[in-house]
Amino acid sequence: MATHQILLRTGDPRDVGTVDALMTAAFDPRYGEAWTRNQCLGVLAMPGVRLTLALVDDRPAGFAMVRSVMDEAELLLLAVDPAFRRRGIGTALLRAVIAEAQMSGIADLHLEVRANNPAVALYTEQGFAKVGERRGYYRGRGGEAFDAHTYRRAV
């Protein structure tokens, strides 16, 4: 089996097309989690927002978007293209987010995730603990409601 190196690089608003394509591939539309292109551009224009892209063989494989304010940061989005899953890309992105938070003097890192999202295993594996629940937070295409859980990790 061939080994493919994961390259992480800082992104910017010019990468919104890549982010949009990765969200389309990674987020199941029935849960209503993907952001629009304009939402991404708006958030990327905000102070304290950092986008990290993961590339495998020069192909976009995933991304993480984080917003920092004072000594707290929130993981806004993390996505890995299904064609690249189970290769450590999500772990590499999350570890990069944690390392950047440590270097920036962040005390706490927060995130919110659909309760039945398989990524919960990644977050708990990386030291996040559930601290809250938002009932019916996500609305699917058919109007179904899905709970969200909030997680926190000291940095």
Q: Model-found features: residue ranges?
A:
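Short amphipathic helical patch at the helix-1/turn junction of helix-turn-helix
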Residues: 80, 113-114
